[in-house]
């Protein structure tokens, strides 16, 4: 989950992302002393002990604090273990002393208290104090979307469809409740467990909007992650849940290629590209991608919000209905991984010079997929047109 301008803990995983397995003692051989991993673990234990001391006694009575796994402008996320069941959970601690923190907390809780869906992270219980709110939630331990893709040896269009079915099903549920996520991106799509058949969980509702009882479902707040933001948001127009469908189109493009359809180091140039809505299917692995897959993307990345597919229509698209039956079963994993590495590398601008280590992706690419996270910096509209 996220709030305000959330950021990741380095080198640990993001809020509500997978918690690294507790490693064995990494002490060096022959009395060489502890290695860097052991030192990092020791430092984390000290950090957790200090953090635990500030926890509400009611929380400590029910949960053992295991690790700090994420932080945001108004929050910290820790991995915990329920004392009686030994089941792992995540606790998000929201600081509510300041107005911004209170508003973020109220916004997030207004959504989480309403949702219950197999593809959406579940709020389990809440503890409140004068200055803090503790949200106990499901813990996704299976890793981020692209971490899993790189780690596995094979990835086909059918694998992509299976993922997108779960995401679209979750979005359809949210939209039926008049809830708009407003920050859909790969980092917020987590595997529930490490198993091969794990489901996907939609997480991070820090920017989500819950429709008013009056029936007014339009929004005006300029927020989101720039690479995934819909053009109507940039134009300062009142917008609807169709912004989530634009983001799903961006995610689909990235999932099939390892690249983003709209990308630029300059935020102003990035916004111009989004407003033009022009992208292409050049380079690997696009020649191997089916026409139906591209049609699915094309029906989402439409400038006119009212013409985009809804989540229900996305689930009924022929590419999804047939589970990509007419598509090539070619393994796309190598090309996608290479493109992910290329984008992660600050020195590489071509597939041929892309780095290939998984660790390089883990440390670099996560920051590249959403270089300017959450609430975006406003630019004069005239500069974008």
From Swiss-Prot:
Disordered, as annotated region: 342-367
Pfam families in UniProt: Pkinase (PF00069)
Question: ATP-binding: present as a keyword of the record?
Answer: yes
UniProt-reported outcome of changing residue 212 to I = In a lung adenocarcinoma sample; somatic mutation
Q: Which InterPro entries match?
A: Kinase-like_dom_sf (IPR011009), Prot_kinase_dom (IPR000719), Protein_kinase_ATP_BS (IPR017441)
Q: Which domain of life is it from?
A: Eukaryota
Keyword vocabulary terms for this entry: ATP-binding, Kinase, Nucleotide-binding, Serine/threonine-protein kinase, Transferase
The GO terms this record gives for MF are: ATP binding; protein serine kinase activity; protein serine/threonine kinase activity
The kind of enzyme this is, by top-level EC class, is transferase
The record lists the catalysed reaction(s) as: L-seryl-[protein] + ATP = O-phospho-L-seryl-[protein] + ADP + H(+); L-threonyl-[protein] + ATP = O-phospho-L-threonyl-[protein] + ADP + H(+)
Q: Kindly give the SUPFAM superfamilies that the UniProt entry links to this protein.
A: Protein kinase-like (PK-like)
- The keyword Transmembrane appears for this protein: no
- Gene3D superfamilies membership: Transferase(Phosphotransferase) domain 1
Residue span(s) of domain Protein kinase: 63-320
Q: What does UniProt give as GO cellular component?
A: cytoplasm
The EC number on file is 2.7.11.1
Protein residues bound to ATP: 69-77, 92
User: Which residue ranges have biased composition labelled Low complexity?
Assistant: 344-359
> Which family is this sequence assigned to?
Belongs to the protein kinase superfamily. CAMK Ser/Thr protein kinase family.
UniProt protein name: Serine/threonine-protein kinase H2
Q: Which organism is it from?
A: Homo sapiens (Human)
